[in-house]
Every structure is written in C-alpha cells, then in structure tokens.
Design a protein with these regions (language model features):
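Surface-exposed alpha-helical segments enriched in charged/polar residues
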Residues: 91-94, 98, 152, 178
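Asp-based, Mg2+/Mn2+-dependent phosphohydrolase catalytic module
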Residues: 2-6, 106, 110-111, 115-203
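N-terminal helical cap/lid subdomain that shapes the substrate entry/recognition surface
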Residues: 2-91, 98-99, 110-114
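Structured helix-beta-strand junction loops
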Residues: 99-100, 203
C-alpha cells in the first residue's frame, strides 16, 4: 500500500443524526418519514454530483412531498444539520500524514456545502491532497468513473503512477467500498478507529 483515500462524512465528520434530521424536517414543514425518500433518493445523487443546485433540489423535494418549501431556509437548515468533527480521527490522520503516506479525500457533497465544509474544517486541506468533492467532478459515488478520477489525482500527488491495488479506500458506505474493491482498490468499510488502525497496519 502506497496511498490512502478517505471518505469525509461518517469518518471525520459524524453523519447527520436522527434528531438533526427531525429538526430539518420541522423547518421545511414535512414529516420526517415523508421527507426521507425525497431527501435521500435520486434527487440527492444528482445534488451531490452537482448536476442540480440547491434551488432545483429543494423544488424537487417540494414536488414529491406536496409541500411548498423555502429552498434558502431549507439549505440553511441542511447545513446546520451537519455533524461534528471527530477529533480522534483527525488526530489519527495527522499521525498518518507524518509517516509520509499520500492521502486523499473523496466526498459526496453538494456545491453549496463545499465552502461551509472547508471553512469549518481547514485541516482537510492541510492533511489531504487531493481533496475531491463530487459536485466539482460532476460525478458521485458509487459511480466507477469517480474512482478513476481519484486514482489519477492521487498519482499526481504521489509523483508516480499508482495502481488501484496501491490504494486503501476507506468509506462507511458498504456499497462504495464494494465498487472500489471491484475496481481493484484495497477496501475498508469504516466502523471505528480501532478497526481502521488495525487494517492499515495489516496492509
């Protein structure tokens, strides 16, 4: 293994909690169980891939739920629902960075979330190169093409051509890890820091 490629949310920033989602649902005026399919389905894939913006995304959610939604208020509530930084994981990444590993980040994220994420998490640009956001690539995981782009960018950072088997890909989504390993990457489905540390030592 010569390089590491990490997801962001669910590893370094906690996933949106049920309580946060319920607060978001109240803001937009939709019952949580009604909101969830429209919020998480194909609309979110396109939103993450940057093929639609926040206004169109929330217009689609409104159409599917039958509720008139103020998209700007919804966006603000969506940003407020983002999770907290995991200090232990960030410290672990710093220790890995000092060992000389090439480390990249690949995150599914809408364009309107990028500025907020970078502002509140400046360590991401300090520790990872490249930092790749799906919306700027016009692709979203688990699309196979996004992994090819990430591998090429990791190779640039490493100063040598990397093969998929040179890279350990870490994500909390089993589907994303499944696709990456099918393409030849080493894979680890993240559950906790202890298991991740053991995996890195093993490879």
């Amino acid at each position: 293994m010569h390089a590491l490629l990490f997801d962001l949310f669910g590893l370094f920033i906690s996933e949106q909690s049920r309580t946060s989602f319920e607060t978001l649902a109240r803001t937009v005026g939709v019952e949580p169980d009604v909101l969830l399919p429209a919020y998480r389905g194909e609309n979110r894939v396109e939103y993450d891939a940057g093929t639609i913006g926040s206004r169109e995304y929330w217009a689609r959610v409104a159409a599917e739920t039958g509720v008139d939604i103020d998209w700007q208020a919804a966006l603000a509530a969506d940003l407020a629902a983002l999770g907290a930084k995991d200090e232990a994981m960030v410290s672990f990444a710093r220790s890995l960075n000092r060992t000389g590993f090439t480390m990249g980040m690949l995150s599914n994220i809408p364009c309107d979330f990028v500025g907020w994420t970078r502002w509140h998490n400046p360590w991401s640009d300090e520790l990872f190169d490249p930092v790749l956001f799906s919306c700027r690539l016009r692709l979203a995981k688990p699309d196979e093409e996004i992994f090819a782009v990430a591998l090429a960018r990791l190779s640039q950072s490493a100063g040598r051509k990397l093969a998929p088997e040179d890279v350990l890909y870490v994500d909390d989504s089993p589907k994303n890890v499944e696709v990456a390993t099918k393409l030849g990457f080493l894979g680890h489905c993240f559950e906790n820091l202890e298991a991740l540390s053991a995996k890195i030592e093993a490879v």
